[in-house]
């Protein structure tokens, strides 16, 4: 009787000791986010998202993101595309604002998921769109647009730009790679023929340089 009780006491003590040792063992971290579905954390701190294809063992890789929220939005778009209204979402309030893939191919789902991941939510949700592109993407797109516009302006300028004529040039004058012809009366081999009407219209300042009356009588 005494031996039986001591055996039970020893077994109970062994069980307690085993339970304590189990508690002390480190719990293996699966990397899954405690809140967001379809989101895991990499050892180097990035967050990844993927989703299983319907009726297949393969998964669609959605990308690696700097924040769990971005990965969660990517998962929501993929879940909506594959499962439809039955999908369990991380952000159900944004379901009407998420981009939709053009088809159910893995590639198109990835593209739509990336668009949703790189958007940030606004404070108020509306039926139109409660998502806007992040500031970094907006700046990049704007710089690209400005750069292309500037390039077009420079090309147009090269087409329509004309050389500056300055004050005056005599004869055939070279300016850079372009030639400008100035029709100067000083280079004429013969004086022009003047009629009486033309003579009356000549300014007085020119009559000092030319004997216009003589030219008229020529």
Swiss-Prot record:
The keyword Ubl conjugation does not apply. Residues 17-32 have a biased composition (Basic and acidic residues). Keywords: Activator, DNA-binding, Nucleus, Transcription, Transcription regulation. InterPro entries: AP2/ERF_dom, AP2/ERF_dom_sf, AP2/ERF_TF_ERF_subfamily, DNA-bd_dom_sf. It is found in: Nucleus. Gene3D superfamilies: AP2/ERF domain. Residues 1-37 are annotated as: Disordered. Putative transcriptional activator. This is Ethylene-responsive transcription factor TINY.
């Amino acid at each position: 009787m005494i031996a039986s009780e001591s055996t039970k006491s020893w077994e109970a003590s062994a069980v307690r000791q085993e339970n304590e040792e189990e508690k002390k063992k480190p719990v293996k971290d699966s990397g899954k986010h405690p809140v967001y579905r379809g989101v895991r954390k990499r050892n180097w701190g990035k967050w990844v998202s993927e989703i299983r294809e319907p009726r297949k063992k393969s998964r669609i890789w959605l990308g690696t993101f700097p924040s769990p929220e971005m990965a969660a939005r990517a998962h929501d778009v993929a879940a909506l595309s594959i499962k439809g209204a039955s999908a369990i979402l991380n952000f159900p309030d944004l379901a009407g604002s998420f981009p939709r893939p053009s088809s159910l191919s893995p590639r198109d789902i990835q593209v739509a998921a990336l668009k949703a991941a790189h958007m940030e939510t606004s404070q108020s949700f509306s039926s139109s769109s409660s998502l806007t592109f992040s500031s970094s993407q907006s700046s990049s797109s704007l710089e690209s647009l400005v750069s292309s516009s500037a390039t077009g302006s420079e090309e147009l300028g090269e087409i329509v730009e004309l050389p500056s004529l300055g004050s005056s040039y005599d004869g055939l004058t070279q300016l850079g790679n372009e030639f400008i012809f100035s029709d100067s009366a000083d280079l004429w081999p013969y004086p022009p023929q003047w009629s009486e009407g033309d003579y009356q219209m000549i300014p007085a300042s020119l009559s000092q340089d030319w004997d216009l009356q003589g030219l008229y009588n020529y």
